[in-house]
């Protein structure tokens, strides 16, 4: 498949009564849509918990959660459209193109004028980078964590590494599912003080950061989680 952007569920020929955007079309999001009288969910991620949103295996196993979630969609004639690649691939911004998801994060945090090139993760060179930030003044790791919690309305953040680090530069750390060799090498060579992490495996990158902190390195990861980092981008999509 060339794109992940497609209708995941429902009848698109019906009249649209309202639109809700979300990072993921969870059961609670579906219930919210029903309550508001809407019938179109624009979701950033897949609907049924797998890459490609395949449903055959769930049908064959008669998965009870799948069947109940599907019934909720059917009973209220809800359509789910996935918008993943488009908003990541570049939207017009100040005469250039920028990743819309992470522009949303920068806007929410007031970091639009602080964007720099991300030295940890390779990024599409055709896009204006929107995944790393340089601050005018240093900020303590704990204070930055609190700012993220308050602004993004989070229940908490996992802090890994030197909790007393002074943050001048921060960067989004993309998916670390297991092998973190490249991310560790790039981090060690960089002057980034804080990593805003999506998925983070304890036995590789997280342990590297813990050891860094124990050796007094000025570096920390703030584990926000995948959806918490990308949700501001789906909020920005409404604009």
PLM features: residue spans?
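Active-site catalytic microenvironments in core metabolic enzymes, especially phosphate/sugar-handling
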Residues: 1-239
């Amino acid at each position: 498949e060339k794109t992940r952007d497609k209708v995941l569920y429902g009848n698109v020929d019906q009249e649209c009564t309202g639109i809700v955007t979300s990072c993921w079309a969870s059961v609670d999001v579906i219930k919210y849509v029903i309550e508001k009288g809407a019938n179109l969910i624009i979701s950033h991620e897949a609907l049924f918990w797998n890459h490609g949103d395949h449903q055959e295996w769930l049908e064959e196993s008669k998965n009870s959660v799948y069947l109940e979630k599907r019934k909720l969609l059917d009973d209220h004639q809800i359509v789910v459209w996935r918008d993943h690649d488009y908003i990541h691939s570049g939207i017009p911004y100040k005469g250039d193109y920028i990743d819309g998801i992470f522009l949303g994060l920068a806007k929410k945090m007031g970091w639009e004028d602080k964007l720099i090139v991300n030295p940890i993760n390779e990024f599409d060179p055709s896009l204006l980078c929107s995944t790393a930030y340089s601050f005018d003044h240093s900020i303590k790791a704990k204070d930055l964590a609190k700012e993220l919690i308050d602004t993004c309305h989070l229940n908490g953040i996992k802090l890994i590494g030197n909790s007393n680090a002074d943050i001048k530069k921060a960067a989004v750390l993309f998916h670390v599912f297991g092998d973190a060799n490249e991310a560790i090498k790039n981090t060690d060579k960089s002057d980034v003080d804080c990593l805003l992490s999506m998925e983070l495996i304890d036995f590789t990158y997280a342990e590297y950061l813990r050891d860094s902190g124990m050796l007094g390195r000025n570096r920390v990861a703030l584990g926000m989680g995948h959806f918490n980092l990308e949700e501001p981008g789906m909020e920005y999509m409404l604009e």
